[in-house]
Swiss-Prot record:
SUPFAM superfamilies xref list: Trypsin-like serine proteases (SSF50494)
Gene Ontology cellular-component annotations: extracellular region
Record bears the keyword Ligase: no
Protein source organism: Staphylococcus aureus (strain MSSA476)
Name of the protein: Serine protease SplC
Subcellular location: Secreted
Active site location: 75 (charge relay system), 113 (charge relay system), 193 (charge relay system)
Keyword vocabulary terms for this entry: Hydrolase, Protease, Secreted, Serine protease, Signal
GO process terms (BP): proteolysis
């Protein structure tokens, strides 16, 4: 990711899955992710809400939205198949909420970068509360709506390999909402694809899909959860 490029259109946003081959200068900078200037902090306990509603892929993020159901991006899910595994709210070497197999993948039919996955309820490797997925995680709820200047947070796994799968929280504000696109200034990096965007009540208003990894950027993007998108997601939540 070249940080000197000015992104001039939403179509040019870089997707935020983590990639190998990052040069040494970028790695050195990203190792300083949790500093005050970026408004990024490492999550101290991923076993409490809302942090226990976030899951990790090997190079991206997702979050729980209902029984055995998680949301991420299409550009994340395209690299996965039924039977592949996700990890519930890992916390570096402190443990995680269990490892689970993907049961089904349903991409949103429009252009929006959303994918819904159903997860096998029984873990391959158990979490602290046993083998049941729903006992080790807590689903996030939809926000009714959102508006410009609302305070938000993004929770996820930026640069997961480099950061040893530690969870981070980034705070900022909504800069604009147009149709199903939400722009915000919270700091994000590769690996944040699929992260939930939460309001001050820890309700989810969208899913991160891209940005430029620059402090103060107002071009970071998420799919805003319109009524139509919420309806699609609700239909794919396991009953």
């Amino acid at each position: 990711m070249n940080k000197n490029i000015v992104i001039k259109s939403m179509a040019a946003l870089a997707i935020l899955t983590s990639a190998t081959g990052i040069n040494a200068a970028v790695v050195e900078e990203t190792q300083q992710i949790a500093n005050a200037e970026k408004n990024v902090t490492q999550v101290k306990d991923t076993n409490i809400f809302p942090y226990n509603g976030v899951v990790s892929f090997k190079d991206a993020t997702g979050f729980v939205i209902g029984k055995n159901t998680i949301i991420t991006n299409k550009h994340v899910s395209k690299d996965y198949k039924v039977g592949d595994r996700i990890t519930a709210h890992p916390d570096g070497d402190k443990g995680n909420g269990g490892i689970y197999k993907i049961k089904s993948i349903s991409d949103y039919p429009g252009d929006e970068d959303i994918s819904v996955m159903n997860i096998e309820e029984q873990a391959v490797e158990r979490g602290p509360k046993g083998f049941n997925f729903n006992e080790n995680v807590q689903a996030l709820n939809f926000a009714k709506d959102a508006k410009v200047d609302d305070k938000i947070k993004v929770i996820g796994y930026p640069l997961p390999a480099q950061n040893s799968f530690k969870q981070f929280e980034s705070t900022g504000t909504i800069k604009r909402i147009k149709d199903n696109i939400l722009n915000f200034d919270a700091y994000i990096e590769p690996g944040n694809s699929g992260s939930p965007v939460l309001n001050s009540n820890n309700e989810v208003i969208g899913v991160v899909y891209g940005g430029i990894g620059k402090i103060g950027s107002e071009y970071n993007g998420a799919v805003y959860f319109t009524p139509q998108i919420k309806d699609f997601i609700q239909k794919h939540i396991e009953q």
